[in-house]
Amino acid sequence: MLDFYNSWYASIQHEEHPFLKKMRIYSVLRFCIRVLANITIPIYYVLTINNKKYSLLGGELKSGRIIVTLTSFPARVNRLWLVIESLLRQSHKPDMIILWLSKDQFSNLDLLPRSLLKLRKRGLQIFLREGDLRSYKKFFYTLSEYPNDVMITVDDDIFYPTFTIEELLKESLKYSFPVVVSRYFSAITQDNLGNCLPYIEWKQLTDKSRDKIFFWFRWWNFIPSGGIV
């Protein structure tokens, strides 16, 4: 279901009809898709939550593991389970999913919503740390404690299509050095006066350009073993 919405949304983003764009028809359509997705995807997740294939298997690897890492804060934690669900449903499952939280914001795990805590049975690991490194938590602690593993950092407010990890791993094989890659890219766009336009108005790069410019990511970032952002 998520992949369907993703494909639908992307097809509208690539439309360039001047009149429809000026009338903001595409913006309205994209808004409707986002609303519909935010209503139906949670329902679908709840109805299929007991499917065993949507859990991490666990393994014997001690290094070279694929670790998905993220962090969050109180304003977003209630819907964070949806992000985790999308990660548990990947076509190429990670070995670990780690959520790093600050004790300044969550003094103990009991303060977290049940919807999130229940995901520990399916492979989610949650760690509390002193202080607050903000968004840097998701890679600082992972690099410190799992230096020999592959790290994929994700955000706490995005539904990730099932092919996310699979495509990142395939893309990483093209490069022999630590690199940040993504599936979608946007080019910084200016108006006629040279002023930078809002991000939502930046033009997406063509497929030919994407092969040359791989450091500007939109959805996720990927760091091979030993890599640093």
Identify what each model region corresponds to.
Residues 68-70, 99, 153:
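Structural beta-sheet core signal
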Residues 83-95, 103, 118:
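Short, acidic, metal-binding catalytic loop of nucleotide-sugar glycosyltransferases
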Residues 95-96, 150:
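Residues at the starts of beta-strands that form the adenosine-phosphate
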Residues 98-102, 182:
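Short internal beta-strands
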Residues 102-149:
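Active-site-proximal specificity loops/subdomain of glycosyltransferases
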Residues 142, 161-229:
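Conserved catalytic core of nucleotide-sugar-dependent glycosyltransferases
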Residues 148-159:
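Short beta-strand-to-loop acidic/aromatic patch adjacent to the donor-nucleotide binding site
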